[in-house]
Swiss-Prot record:
Residues that bind ATP: 35-42
SUPFAM superfamilies associated with the record: P-loop containing nucleoside triphosphate hydrolases
An individual GO BP term: phosphate ion transmembrane transport
ABC transporter domain: residues covered: 3-230
Keyword annotations from UniProtKB, A to Z: ATP-binding, Cell membrane, Membrane, Nucleotide-binding, Phosphate transport, Translocase, Transport
Gene3D superfamilies reported for this sequence: P-loop containing nucleotide triphosphate hydrolases
Natural source organism: Caldanaerobacter subterraneus subsp. tengcongensis (strain DSM 15242 / JCM 11007 / NBRC 100824 / MB4) (Thermoanaerobacter tengcongensis)
Higher taxonomy: Bacteria, Bacillati, Bacillota, Clostridia, Thermoanaerobacterales
Name of the featured protein: Phosphate import ATP-binding protein PstB 1
Subunit structure comment from the entry: The complex is composed of two ATP-binding proteins (PstB), two transmembrane proteins (PstC and PstA) and a solute-binding protein (PstS).
Catalysed reactions listed for this entry: phosphate(out) + ATP + H2O = ADP + 2 phosphate(in) + H(+)
Protein origin, superkingdom: Bacteria
Record membrane topology: Peripheral membrane protein
InterPro entries: AAA+_ATPase, ABC_transporter-like_ATP-bd, ABC_transporter-like_CS, P-loop_NTPase, PstB-like
Length: 239
C-alpha cells in the first residue's frame, strides 16, 4: 500500500499542528516518527486513519484521495493502536471478534490472532480488566489484525510498558512487518527507533524536517534542528 500526504496542513485552536507536510509511505518497512512533544506526530497518525480531516492538502491511498474511499474499508486496511490500550468491556475473544462480527462475519478464529501476538488460548475468555498493560496492548494489536490490515499505525504502544513487555511488542512489530504489514510507529524512545526503524521521519513544530533511512538520520542528521534534537539540546532552542 502507498500512503501519500500531499501538502497536508492541520489547523486547530488558532495554530497549525501540521504544516505543509509532504511524504509518501511507499515501501514496506517500519517507519518511526520522532520529534518533541507537540510536534504533530500523533496528529499525523490520526489524519492517516481519518479520525480527523486535513484543513488543507490531501491524503491519497494507492493514488486515490482517501475522501473517496469508504471510511470503514479504510480503517480495515489501516489499523491503529493507541498509546493506552482501548478495549471494550468483556472477554479477550469478544474484543478480537468485534470488527469482523460487526461486518456480519461468522466463525472468526480469534485464537489465530491471539496466537499471532504471542498469547495462548488460556487468554481467550479472560476479562480484559484482568490483563497486564503488555497483555492488553497485544490484545489491541490482535484486534487490529483481525481486520487483515495492510498498514498498522502505532502511537507510542510501549511508552507505559516495562522493558520485558516492550521487547515482546518490538519483536512482534518486526515479525508483522516481515509478514508484509507496513508499520508506522510514533515513539519518544530514540533507542527504540534505532532498534526497529527502517526509515525515520523527524517532525518539529508541525513541519517534516527530515525523512531518511533510520541509520542515516541518527548517524548523519542534515538539519541543525535534527542535530540539536538528537543531542538533547532542542529545549534550549525552544526557549
Amino acid at each position: 500500500m502507498e500512503i501519500e500526504l500531499k501538502n497536508v496542513n492541520y489547523f486547530r485552536d488558532g495554530k497549525y499542528i501540521l504544516k505543509n507536510v509532504y511524504f509518501k509511505f511507499e515501501k514496506n518497512g517500519i517507519y518511526t516518527v520522532v520529534g518533541p512533544s507537540g510536534a504533530g506526530k500523533s496528529t499525523m497518525l490520526k489524519l492517516i486513519n481519518r479520525l480527523i480531516e486535513p484543513t488543507e492538502g490531501a491524503i491519497f491511498i494507492n493514488g486515490v484521495e482517501y475522501k473517496n474511499i469508504d471510511v470503514i474499508l479504510l480503517r480495515r486496511k489501516i489499523g491503529m493502536v493507541f498509546q493506552r490500550p482501548f478495549l471494550f468491556e468483556g472477554t479477550v475473544k469478544e474484543n478480537i471478534e468485534l470488527g469482523p462480527s460487526l461486518r456480519g462475519e461468522k466463525n472468526i478464529d480469534a485464537l489465530f490472532y491471539l496466537e499471532a501476538v504471542g498469547l495462548s488460548k488460556d487468554y481467550l475468555f479472560k476479562d480484559v480488566n484482568n490483563l497486564s498493560g503488555g497483555e492488553a496492548q497485544r490484545v489491541s494489536i490482535a484486534r487490529a489484525l483481525a481486520n487483515s490490515p495492510e498498514v498498522l499505525l502505532l502511537d507510542e504502544p510501549t511508552s507505559s510498558l516495562d522493558p520485558t513487555s516492550t521487547s515482546i511488542i518490538e519483536e512482534l512489530i518486526k515479525r508483522l512487518n516481515r509478514e508484509g504489514i507496513m508499520v508506522i510507529l510514533v515513539t519518544h524512545n530514540m533507542e527504540q527507533a534505532k532498534r526497529i526503524g527502517d526509515y525515520t521521519l523527524f517532525l518539529y513544530k508541525g513541519e517534516l524536517i527530515e525523512a531518511r533511512k533510520t541509520w542515516e538520520f541518527f548517524e548523519n542528521p542534515v538539519s541543525e534542528v535534527s542535530k540539536l534534537f538528537l543531542e538533547g539540546k532542542l529545549k534550549e532552542m525552544i526557549k
